[in-house]
């Protein structure tokens, strides 16, 4: 921090199917970083996995196809080498902390978190165990079920073991939702009613992952809340918010989330009885701990008409876009976007010390 500012590398883009969502999220993070406090260094992770130095100009992040690459030094405690297109490599200014805004595989699954640990550089956000456990919906379900938390009934599907449609219908009823086990943002998710739907869902799902989940349909409201951990380990759980997909979308799909501006209605806070909301918040905190998460997560639920609370999933790098729920529920709970960033950085520095 020679300049007196904290040098924070913001990773965005990435190799996953959520690449474009990451760019939207990182743009908001860059806008929220206080320039008086932070020297933000955006680094674009290409779809091939290269780390290229980027720039934030006029409110937009550049996405270079080539240029200077940034390479962390193992055990370097923030040292990094820049490899330019031409000329000799040189040592970059010391990195104080990495802030990954990478959704899905290779960013939210413990991979980047492990790289930061090997390089001995602090990282904002969830660490290795929670990231790996939460991203894999199959593993996450097994862990939270073991802890006594309720989830939707499901069947795990691999390329080697694809059950017959009739068997799934008997086990789960109709409709069924097919989803990649290790993707977010509703990428590759399909609502299945017929054998033809099932075959199409299998073909598409296996593009994104080698493991899929078939889940029962639950007629319920979709409710989410945010969890934020301070550097001392105390958890703050936000008020709950509700997502109501438009009638033009049969579920909370990728298009409803990010493409169609009128794809969803977001109600913050959700209109829930106090007792139900308090139970949701308590389950969110428990699930966060059960999966070994730290720092932050968004926890998603179904709430049925008879007020049964069903845990859906946990996202350790929730969307940071204008339409994202995490920051809306935190704001209504009294925590602003810049304050969330500050707390994530403080937590990462404390964990890395």
UniProtKB/Swiss-Prot annotation:
Enzyme Commission code: 6.3.2.4
Alphabetically ordered keywords of this record: ATP-binding, Cell shape, Cell wall biogenesis/degradation, Cytoplasm, Ligase, Magnesium, Manganese, Metal-binding, Nucleotide-binding, Peptidoglycan synthesis
Pathway recorded for this protein: Cell wall biogenesis; peptidoglycan biosynthesis
Record GO biological process: cell wall organization; peptidoglycan biosynthetic process; regulation of cell shape
Cofactor(s) in the UniProt record: Mg(2+); Mn(2+)
Binding locations of Mg(2+) 1: 300, 313
Gene3D superfamilies, sorted: 3.40.50.20, ATP-grasp fold, A domain (3.30.1490.20), ATP-grasp fold, B domain (3.30.470.20)
Catalytic activity: 2 D-alanine + ATP = D-alanyl-D-alanine + ADP + phosphate + H(+)
Cofactor binding description: Binds 2 magnesium or manganese ions per subunit.
Molecular function via GO: ATP binding; D-alanine-D-alanine ligase activity; metal ion binding
Subcellular locations according to the entry: Cytoplasm
Binding site for Mg(2+) 2: 313, 315
Domain ATP-grasp: 141-346
Family: Belongs to the D-alanine--D-alanine ligase family.
HAMAP family assigned to the protein according to its UniProt record, in alphabetical order: Dala_Dala_lig (MF_00047)
The name this protein goes by in its record: D-alanine--D-alanine ligase A
């Amino acid at each position: 921090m020679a300049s007196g500012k904290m040098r924070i590398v913001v990773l965005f883009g990435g190799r996953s199917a959520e690449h474009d969502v990451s760019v939207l999220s990182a743009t908001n993070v860059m806008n929220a970083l206080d320039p008086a406090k932070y020297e933000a260094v955006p680094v674009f992770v290409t779809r091939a996995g290269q780390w290229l130095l980027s720039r934030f100009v006029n409110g937009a992040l550049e996405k270079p196809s080539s240029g200077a690459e940034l390479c962390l030094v193992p055990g370097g405690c923030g040292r990094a080498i820049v490899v330019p297109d031409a000329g000799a490599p040189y040592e970059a200014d010391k990195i104080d902390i990495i802030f990954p805004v990478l959704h899905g595989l290779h960013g939210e699954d413990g991979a980047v978190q492990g790289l930061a640990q090997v390089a001995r550089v602090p990282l904002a956000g969830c660490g290795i165990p929670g990231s790996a456990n939460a991203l894999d919906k199959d593993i996450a379900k097994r862990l939270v079920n073991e802890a006594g938390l309720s989830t939707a009934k499901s069947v795990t599907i691999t390329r080697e073991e694809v059950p017959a449609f009739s068997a799934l219908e008997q086990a789960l009823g109709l409709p069924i939702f097919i989803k990649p086990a290790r993707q977010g943002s509703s990428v590759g998710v399909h609502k299945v009613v017929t054998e033809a739907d099932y075959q199409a869902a299998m073909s598409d799902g296996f593009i994104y992952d080698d493991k899929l989940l078939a889940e029962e349909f639950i007629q319920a409201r979709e409710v989410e809340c945010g969890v934020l951990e301070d550097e001392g380990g105390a958890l703050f759980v936000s008020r709950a918010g509700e997502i109501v997909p438009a009638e033009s979308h049969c579920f909370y799909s990728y298009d409803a989330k990010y493409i169609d501006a009128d794809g969803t209605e977001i109600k913050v806070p959700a209109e829930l009885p106090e007792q139900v909301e308090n139970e949701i918040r308590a389950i969110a905190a428990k699930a966060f701990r059960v999966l070994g998460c730290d720092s932050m997560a968004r926890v998603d639920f179904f709430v049925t008409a008879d007020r049964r609370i069903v845990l859906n999933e946990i996202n350790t790098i929730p969307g940071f876009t204008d339409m994202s729920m995490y920051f809306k529920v935190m704001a209504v709970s009294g925590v602003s976007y810049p304050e969330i960033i500050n707390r994530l950085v403080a937590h990462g520095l404390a964990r890395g010390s």
